[in-house]
């Protein structure tokens, strides 16, 4: 099967109502849940890797996918794992860490890393840009505090303060 396009081009060329954007986020979240449920981390989520097949959105480009609890060739220190601008904080820490750094950072790339990247993709879907740094309420368009709260949780720079499961994200999106 060939994709008819990617999310980036779709959003650039279509005016999509807010409710449809939430549905799009939910469809992508369910795709990530499917990967998680069979034991995989994607690690390369970005708009260019969300592909449309007929009227269905699917997560593509599985080149950096990793099976949970298995060593992966891309998990060495200083390896750049994932797309620039869409990396989770732990992926960036892994890339930048040095042997003589007395501070130890959580550099495990896992499902919560995918949740962070997915939060960036959702922000892009809703705002038309990628969030940079710590997000603030004033960075987000007026109204829709419910979705902002979900995004802020997903985009927390501390993995310990991020959703531990994509199920939480799906449940919250379903209520909007």
Where do the PLM segments sit?
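Conserved short submotifs of the Hanks-type protein kinase catalytic core
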Residues: 1-6
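Activation segment signature within eukaryotic-like protein kinase domains
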Residues: 24-25
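Conserved C-terminal C-lobe helix
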Residues: 143-156
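A conserved short helix/loop substructure at the end of the activation segment
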Residues: 155-168
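Activation segment/activation loop of eukaryotic-type protein kinase catalytic domains
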Residues: 53-86
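Catalytic-loop of the protein kinase fold
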Residues: 36-52
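AlphaC helix of the protein kinase catalytic domain
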Residues: 7-16
């Amino acid at each position: 099967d060939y994709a008819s396009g990617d999310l980036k081009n779709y959003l650039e060329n279509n005016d999509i109502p807010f409710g449809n954007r939430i549905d799009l986020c939910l469809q992508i979240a369910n795709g990530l849940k499917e990967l998680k449920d069979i034991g995989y981390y994607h690690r390369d989520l970005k708009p260019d890797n969300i592909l449309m097949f007929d009227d269905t959105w699917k997560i593509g480009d599985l080149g950096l996918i990793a099976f949970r609890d298995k060593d992966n060739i891309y998990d060495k220190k200083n390896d750049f794992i994932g797309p620039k601008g869409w990396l989770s904080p732990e992926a960036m820490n892994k890339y930048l860490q040095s042997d003589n750094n007395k501070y130890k950072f959580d550099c495990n790339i896992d499902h919560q890393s995918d949740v962070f990247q997915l939060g960036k993709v959702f922000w892009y879907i809703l705002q038309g840009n990628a969030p940079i740094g710590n997000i603030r309420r004033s960075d987000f368009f007026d109204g829709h505090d419910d979705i902002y709260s979900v995004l802020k949780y997903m985009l927390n720079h501390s993995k310990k303060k991020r959703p531990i499961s994509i199920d939480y994200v799906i449940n919250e999106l379903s209520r909007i």
